[in-house]
Curated annotation (Swiss-Prot):
The keyword DNA-binding does not apply. Belongs to the YejK family. GO terms for molecular function: double-stranded DNA binding; single-stranded RNA binding. Keywords: Cytoplasm. HAMAP family: NdpA. This is Nucleoid-associated protein VC_2039. InterPro entries: Nucleoid_associated_NdpA. Coiled coil: none annotated. It comes from Vibrio cholerae serotype O1 (strain ATCC 39315 / El Tor Inaba N16961). GO terms for cellular component: bacterial nucleoid; cytoplasm. Its main location: cytoplasm. Pfam families: NA37.
Length: 333
């Protein structure tokens, strides 16, 4: 990976003897060397691979935004910027019951001609190591793959298009932890692009296009499969869905209307590009549902062939059960 590191620093958030969250500040920024470059490169890679990211933008009165602008202009040293940010993060984090301890990593860097600011509170875990004398001793390590209190600012996008609603991205975190809430409060930012909604609008547009084009059942299944495969490939590549690019891979309607023109003419409010949501696009090729002790998933092409639904009685009939399920059912009789 081509990465140019400008600044990186670590501070520690921990609880004192009174169970109060405090900040242990590092005395100075880390040196830019192979170790720190490798650390930031790994943080960048893992963040890109994380699913379920949210997007946002600064509020007009964001104090953090003012600090960031001063830091970028050179009137506020990066070290002081990191101290102010660490204190602000501690104050926000202390309001929540989970109040995680960890190592705060702040890094200003460039990757693929794009400037970024990374801010993340990483778990500090213990493991074992073998010394040169073949003894066993404890060692601390940063659990980068488990990080979920993280945000990244696309500085290039922010500085060239302040009207953008997505230059700030963050990991939403585990359900119930409200990670997104406090991190947005810390940055004094609002939720911007709603990726879940964009994916749902895309799915509806696909349904409507197929209906408007009067596709046969087999054509609808094939069309949805192509959309799913494109979206899934984008997810695997860490790339975004580009509506015009997607349209170029899909067949037009019998009247010659392509998918991109259809979404524009019908007023679907789709961004030019957005991250694909795995759970949403999966529904293009599968029926999925859970509740009341049931968890069902089957290929959409089976509906009407091996799986039948009666809406009047709300009954689902399956003809031909999977062998492993059939074996379990017959053994319990």
């Amino acid at each position: 990976m081509s990465l140019f590191l400008s600044n990186v620093i670590l501070h520690q958030l921990r609880k004192n003897d009174n169970d109060e969250l405090v900040v242990n500040y590092r005395a100075e920024s880390l040196r830019n060397d192979t170790s720190t470059e490798n650390l930031v490169a790994e943080l960048h890679r893992v963040f890109n691979a994380k699913a379920g990211k949210g997007f946002g933008c600064f509020k007009s009165d964001s104090e953090f935004q003012l600090w960031l602008q001063e830091m970028r202009r050179g009137t506020l040293p990066f070290y002081e910027f990191s101290q102010q940010s660490a204190q602000r993060l501690k104050n926000e984090l202390a309001k929540y019951p989970f109040a995680d301890e960890g190592i705060l990593v702040m890094a200003e860097y460039q990757s693929l001609a794009t400037d970024y600011l990374f801010i993340g509170l990483l778990p500090l875990n213990q493991s074992l190591k073998v010394t040169e004398g073949l003894d066993i001793s404890a060692t601390d390590y940063l659990d980068i793959n488990k990080m979920d209190i993280v945000a990244r600012i696309d500085l290039s996008s922010y500085e060239t298009d302040k009207e953008s609603k997505r230059y700030l991205s963050y990991i939403k975190g585990r359900v119930g932890r409200k990670v997104a809430d406090f991190f947005l409060d810390f940055l004094q930012a609002d939720i911007g692009l709603d990726t879940k909604q964009q994916n749902q609008v895309l799915m509806q547009a696909v349904e409507d296009f197929c209906a408007d084009a009067k596709f046969e059942k087999e054509e609808v299944i094939s069309y949805k499969k192509q959309v799913y495969e494109y979206c899934n490939d984008q997810i695997k590549a860490g790339d975004e869905v580009r509506v015009q690019e997607l349209s170029g891979e899909l067949p037009p309607s019998n009247e010659g209307v392509n998918f991109f023109d259809f979404t524009r003419e019908q007023g679907y409010q789709l961004e030019e590009s957005f991250p694909a949501d795995r759970s949403t696009v999966r529904k293009l090729t599968k029926y999925v549902g859970a509740g009341g002790g049931l968890n069902l998933s089957f290929d959409s092409l089976l509906l009407g062939e091996r799986v039948f639904y009666d809406p009047e009685t709300d009954t689902l009939t399956i003809k031909g059960t999977p062998p492993n399920l059939r074996d379990q059912l017959t053994r319990l009789r």
